[in-house]
UniProtKB/Swiss-Prot annotation:
The active site is at K244. Its EC number is 2.3.1.37. The gene is hemA. It catalyses: succinyl-CoA + glycine + H(+) = 5-aminolevulinate + CO2 + CoA. SUPFAM superfamilies: PLP-dependent transferases (SSF53383). This is 5-aminolevulinate synthase. It comes from Rickettsia bellii (strain RML369-C). Pathway: Porphyrin-containing compound metabolism; protoporphyrin-IX biosynthesis; 5-aminolevulinate from glycine: step 1/1. One of its GO terms (molecular function) is 5-aminolevulinate synthase activity. Substrate binds at R22, S133, K152, T359. The modification N6-(pyridoxal phosphate)lysine is found at K244.
Length: 414
């Protein structure tokens, strides 16, 4: 083994010893039988998929994709500046701006890139900028802020009092931006959006909200928590994804014309990469349009979420209680979390990927359950029974959600 191979092997061995080694499952999703998939020639029920509403297989979206690929081909052919600025992506950007009631939008190849490159570029455009970021913001937000090398202040999770203290420490005339998520993907808690908006106004700051886990799911037309709270007009930059509730791929930001144009002209992560293919842009546009008009998917989704949480309450399964659709089951041990995930798959044909550090803090390792409108009462009952039996086999204690919430909160702020 070479010197360099030894370095890589030692790194992998360390991760394995901590129970954090990740193995990817070879899945074959069944578009005509959602949320089922095939894994090792066995049919399984998927409980951890981010295709929240099953829009990836919706007839309107699928047909639009077929029509687009026959008309435009598979790829986009280049960057937005050189050959890749197709009509389909322009139509998608118009649809996104309309969805969020903003003047303009800009589409990126992923939600990660949208956050990373936008935040870094804002710092390039405003060299004296100060970032204020929630301590549990997504890795893409952290990457953008850290990579910008701008001054940053990290406020305690969802703590607007601490945020205000930090804002007070910076000259009110200095450019600043508060960056936060509407819903946090690992615990499902909502941000105090209106309180943050009020602080931004008071201290002359821009607001940047990540609506990745809420667009399509909340609000009258699916525009997210800002729409639900009727405050979209008070937020400067809304970021979202096309890869979750809308069932496709890509990320975006929406804002006023001047901000979007400045990012378009300056963001390396936008300029120097091939654009989304027309087939994807077309599919996303049709998915957005459908969910703007139809509330049935959102209504059914919320009903399934409520049924799942009620079932977990009956079985005393220790999930982290929140008001969102994200249902984290806290295990608190990386080895047991991995074993629980494998037992669900191998013994019960249920797929729930375990989540360990560094995605979540040590001691809060978990199974994150993602309900969809397609999950049935029988599936909910099967999952609940399987979890109780696995908890018993692994000697994982059942506890009330109140006790769990208190315990996790202490871990998060430690």
């Amino acid at each position: 083994m070479s010197y360099y191979d030894t370095i890589f092997s030692d790194h992998i061995d360390k991760i394995k010893s901590e129970g954090r080694y990740r193995e990817f499952k070879a899945l074959k999703r069944q578009a005509d039988n959602f949320p089922f998939a095939m894994c090792d020639d066995k049919q399984i029920v998927m409980w951890c998929i981010n295709d929240y509403l099953g829009m990836s297989k919706h007839p309107k979206v699928v047909q639009a994709s077929i029509d687009a690929v026959l008309k435009y081909g598979v790829g986009s052919g280049g960057t937005r500046n050189i050959g890749g600025n197709n009509v389909a992506i322009l139509e998608l950007e118009q649809e996104l701006a309309s969805l969020h009631n903003k003047e303009a939008s800009l589409v990126f190849t992923s939600g990660f890139v949208a956050n990373d490159t936008t935040l870094a570029t804002l710092a390039k455009i405003m060299p004296n900028i100060v970032f204020f970021s929630d301590e549990l913001n997504h890795a893409s937000i952290i990457a953008g802020i850290t990579g910008s090398k701008a001054e940053k202040h990290i406020y305690r999770h969802l703590d607007v009092k601490h945020l205000e203290e930090l804002l007070q420490s910076v000259d009110i005339n200095r450019p600043k931006i508060i960056v936060f998520e509407s819903a946090y993907s690992m615990d499902g808690f909502f941000s105090p959006v209106k309180d943050i908006i009020n602080l931004a106004k008071k201290y002359n700051a821009l607001t940047f909200i990540d609506e990745v886990h809420t667009v399509g799911l909340y609000g009258k037309t699916g525009a997210g928590i800002a729409e639900l709270l009727d405050c979209s007009d008070e937020i400067d930059i809304i970021q979202g994804t096309l890869a979750k509730a809308y069932g496709t791929i890509g990320g975006y930001i929406t804002a006023n014309h001047s901000l979007i144009d400045a990012i378009r002209l300056s963001a390396s992560g936008f300029i120097f990469t091939t654009s989304l293919p027309p087939v994807i842009s077309t599919a996303a546009t049709h998915s957005i349009r459908h969910l703007k008009e139809s509330n049935q998917e959102r209504k059914t989704h919320q009903q399934v979420v409520s049924k799942l949480k009620s079932s977990f309450d009956r079985f005393n399964i220790p999930y982290l209680k929140n008001e969102s659709h994200i249902v984290p089951i806290i295990i608190g041990d990386p080895i047991k979390a991995s074993k629980a995930s494998n037992m669900l798959l191998n013994e019960y044909s249920i797929y729930v990927q375990h989540i360990n550090f560094p995605t979540v803090p040590r001691g809060t390792e978990r199974l994150r359950i993602i309900p969809t409108p397609a999950h049935t009462d029988e599936m909910i009952n099967d999952l609940s029974i399987a979890l109780v039996q696995i908890f018993a086999a692994l000697n994982i204690e059942l506890s009330s959600t109140k006790e769990l919430n208190d315990e996790i909160y202490l871990n998060l702020i430690a």
